[in-house]
Amino acid sequence: MKSKKSKFITKDILKEAIIESFKKLNPKYMMKNPVMFVVEVGFFVTILLTIFPSIFGDKGHNLRVYNLIVTIILFITVLFANFAESVAEGRGKAQADALKKTRKDTIAKLIGKDGSIKTINANELKKGDVVLVENGDVIPNDGEVVDGVASVDESAITGESAPVMKEPGGDFASVTGGTKVVSDWLKVEITATPGESFLDKMINLVEGASRQKTPNEIALNTILVSLTLIFLIVLVALYPMATYTGVKIPMSTLIALLVCLIPTTIGGLLSAIGIAGMDRVTRFNVIAMSGKAVEACGDVDTMILDKTGTITYGNRLAADFITVGGADKQKLIDYSVMCSLKDDTPEGKSIVELGKQLGITIDTKKYESIEFEEFTAQTRMSGIKLENGTAVKKGAYDAIKKRVQELKGVIPKDLDEAVNKVAKLGGTPLVVCVDNKIYGVIYLKDTVKPGLVERFERLREIGIKTIMCTGDNPLTAATIAKEAGVDGFIAECKPEDKIEAIKKEQDEGKLVAMTGDGTNDAPALAQADVGLAMNSGTTAAKEAANMVDLDSDPTKVLEVVEIGKQLLITRGALTTFSIANDVAKYFAIIPAIFTIAIPKMQLMNIMHLSTPYSAILSALIFNAIIIPALIPIAMKGVKYRPMKSEALLLRNMIVFGFGGIIVPFVGIKIIDMIITPMVRILNLG
């Protein structure tokens, strides 16, 4: 899977992150992160203890120096946590700045009701206004093409250098504000008010201005706050108990113990993980309307996938004409081409092209005044009505069969055989009829995208079921489904069938993802837990979905699901690591506190740390430096491998649980060896 590659951190991002780290020290801001707020409060208390070492009756050699060292380490701990968040935000802001360059003061050519053109600022445009955009002009806002055909450079938004053809109707009518017309002209009806375009939404999202905490983040934050309160209560109770038993514990040591035991590591990285998850999605050219949408991707159980464009290339091209009922093949080709002359779909154009290759010549002027009936999901057929009243139709087997039967026509005995022949080849059969007589079948050939079997197998390994939706008959659907490797399929699928399929899965407690681009997909996109709309699709589809793919690649839903899973795994892994850290820090600090008054506590000093003060400072230093050490993992995410939930849990428990115990044991011991000479020189204690 490809994404926009960028440096992990640039000089500009680093400089901005350092400045922001200091700005975030404001207690009002720190209160948003209760765990780190407790650390900051501890920092202010130790400042007081540095100035007045005996304020709580504490005694000891060079206590002021010891308190000062604890103060500095606590300050650095808070600063590192702010730095982690600032780096994540900085990467988003850098991307936003690049996008802002495309959002200049654009001039719009507003077309009046009388056809006159008035030049106004793009900010004055309203929904429903129609503007003229000519070669070299920047499209002033999101809209739908109502007239004209032109090439549009979307590289400012999508990163794709190749221009995209835009024309009225179909999948290529939608245009995005900030993109540039590089040939011809377009008339565009504005569909977004200023400040609410996709460019504006994208800038707000990557800047983090509109980022709200997700339900999982809130739940985890609640657990972290609860743990912090528990340890705070324990420490408050420990002080009088220790005093009663004759153990003198300096207040700064108690604060150090509290900071080391509360989950500061994950507390300092939690916001960065969430922001980084959104950042990874945007680097795949997907706009997520919220962090909740990205998280939902990680919990998806079922994926509803359109066959065309997602599983197959969607370029169904006419490959053959098959006659039935003894019909003349020349007439079948004539009628097929005739009812496709005004069909602007790729299928319709390919039928006309194949007819030309077979020597058919039709006077197109003769049919200019004839009305064309477009294909719809309800009728599942298209065609024309000649001046003499004759109706020439092409469409799905069951739709044409029903029409012919209603007109008292006869169904050729070899029709089923012809349809099944095409279906078994994985093609789509289009049946052609003139009034109540069926002439034959058009074989539309499509190709399954390579590599899907392996990708669906990966999804199956992590418990995600895939269902293919297609308007094809059951035989064709079964052939394509088997070739692609999906778990199930819905043949002859209508828009309402997709909604029913989604509701059925949701009623079983499953989360569902789906892709779509048409207005008829909008209800299903809104119903799905994860709805990924194509940027080339209709405005209705994009408004209904909670994610939009700027590249208009339906297969990207597979990558988005993996990003969501990676986000959840990263958060879970680092939480496990953070809590496991406490075990090692417990064995470092507890013996150090009590070993002087209770010599037998020395047995708990399994790391053989040199002195009580070196043990406390070593644990505190490790607690601070582990935060920036884990920033790359928080930003890039834990490496994701498709596997069963049980195996994934076991792997992460071994790597981040057991590793979360071993790493601090080793780290604290190394730090202790480094700082012991300094502790002895300062004669702390």
From Swiss-Prot:
Select a single GO molecular function from the record's annotations and give it. ATP hydrolysis activity
Q: How does it sit in the membrane?
A: Multi-pass membrane protein
Q: What are the UniProt keywords, alphabetically?
A: ATP-binding, Cell membrane, Ion transport, Magnesium, Membrane, Metal-binding, Nucleotide-binding, Phosphoprotein, Potassium, Potassium transport, Translocase, Transmembrane, Transmembrane helix, Transport
* Residues annotated to bind Mg(2+): 517, 521
Locate the residues binding ATP: 343, 347, 375-382, 394
Q: Which InterPro entries match?
A: ATPase_P-typ_cyto_dom_N, ATPase_P-typ_P_site, ATPase_P-typ_TM_dom_sf, ATPase_P-typ_transduc_dom_A_sf, HAD-like_sf, HAD_sf, P-type_ATPase_bsu_IA, P_typ_ATPase
Subcellular location(s) of the protein: Cell membrane
The protein's Enzyme Commission number: 7.2.2.6
Can you tell me which residues form the catalytic site?
306
Principal location: membrane
HAMAP family from the UniProt entry:
KdpB (MF_00285)
Name of the protein in question: Potassium-transporting ATPase ATP-binding subunit
Which species is this record about?
Clostridium acetobutylicum (strain ATCC 824 / DSM 792 / JCM 1419 / IAM 19013 / LMG 5710 / NBRC 13948 / NRRL B-527 / VKM B-1787 / 2291 / W)
